[in-house]
Amino acid sequence: MEEETKVVKKVTGPAKPQKLRSIDVELAQKLNTGSSQTKSSALYKLRSVVKNEKLTEIQLLKIWKGLFLSLYNTDKPIVQEEFSRDISKLTTYFKDYKDSLMFIKCFFIILQKHWDYIDKYRVDKFYSLVRKMLNSSFQILKKRNAQHEEGSEEEEARLALNEQIYSGLVKIFKSTVLNTSSDSTTNTNGVLLHFADIYLEELFKVTQGHMEPINLTKILLPFVNFLTKSEDDVSCKRIKERVFDRLLTTYSPFDKKDAYYLPKVGVSSSTPEIFPTDYEMFSKLFFKCASSKDTLEQNRKTLYGLKNQFKRAQAALEELEELADNIVLDENGDIVENPNVNPEDLQGDDSDDSDEEFDVDQMDSEDSGEGEFDDEIDADDAEELDDDDDEEFDEELDEEDEEEEEEEEEEVPPPPPTKNLKSKPSPVTQKNKQQQQQPPAKPAPITKKQQQSPAKPTQVTKKQQSPAKPTPVTKKQQSPVKPTSPKVVKKPTRK
């Protein structure tokens, strides 16, 4: 009996206290279950934990791992949209904005780490989650942006808080989705490309363009840093087209749309989307980055191009402001004449116009006097042109005579082929030679092939031609030698 009692004591003795699971592990496991009720209850509990407890970065990473797997296994588009919306709303439930920023940072870390596991059938719902999380990130700015009286302590505290939130978001985007270092958590740029596509759209949805130009410049600094240091040409091109080119067209007062703009509901010419952009500041910023020693050589061309684009946009904006100063609208919104214009100024303008008309008449009279002198010059030129026409007419007659001689030479049978001469006598020297000899019998016409033959006895070389320069053959000298009657051609008259 004693042995039996001892055994019973060992079995039925007090159990060791089990180690309690932390709240983050428990929530992650419940979120990863297949039951929709368990997921909804875990999400509701997570909402209360976020409001009342302070979580560390490691705990938030574990929670986001469970949320990622839960969305990965969720089917049906409507259910996916509701689940993504509930997840994104958690960002605004934190009491301290630092915890909200930490929650956003952990989201991008987990998403980039597991992006390679997302296939083409699940990528759309994660794109939707990225859009909603980015919208919630900008909601933090709007939530902390309550206006107070200028110069008050509350207003100064609000400005300091906004400065911290903007700088915090910039650091998160630089270290996660827009990270340019080689030790990045992912080798893909899928998140970055979609992030650049939706950045300005979600920012305008939250702010409606009501933000200071300096804050807009701060919130776009991660993209400028990426263009300066990144070696990814595809991502740099996407950022230029979807962020900065869009800032110069779609979200500008110039009534332009970028090449990738899609029409939206409720957006028209009467309600344009405009950001208060400081184009001059961006131009100086791009110039400073392009001329920096740390900038990659392959990215300088893009940065200098953006610098020139923003500089031209600043000049165009100044022209619009000058035009807007001269426009006055009535109660109905119609354009009316500016009442500040002095009528005496208009009269002064009329007197100036009369003076200009007088000057124009005087200039016309001066031009008419110069015209007579020009007529005299034209008459002298006409005489010179007539002399030139005579010389051209004589040259035409010479060419016709040569053509007739060539036709007669073609009738004679050609001699046997011989070697070609390097030098060829000119037709003018042949005519002079015929005039000097004047044989009693008419010699046979000389063909081109006979002129080229080396066996010709009477051959004129360049040395023989050099001392005695032949005089130009005139029309009278050619007439007695011609075997045929010269053609009579009327001399053209100059009009």
Swiss-Prot record:
Where is this chain compositionally biased, Acidic residues type? 346-412
Name the keywords, alphabetized. Answer: Nucleus, rRNA processing
Kindly list the GO CC terms recorded for this protein: nucleus; preribosome, small subunit precursor
Main site of residence?
Answer: nucleus
> Which InterPro entries does this entry report, sorted A to Z?
RRP1
What is the protein's known function?
May be involved in the generation of 28S rRNA.
Which protein are we looking at?
A: Ribosomal RNA processing protein 1 homolog
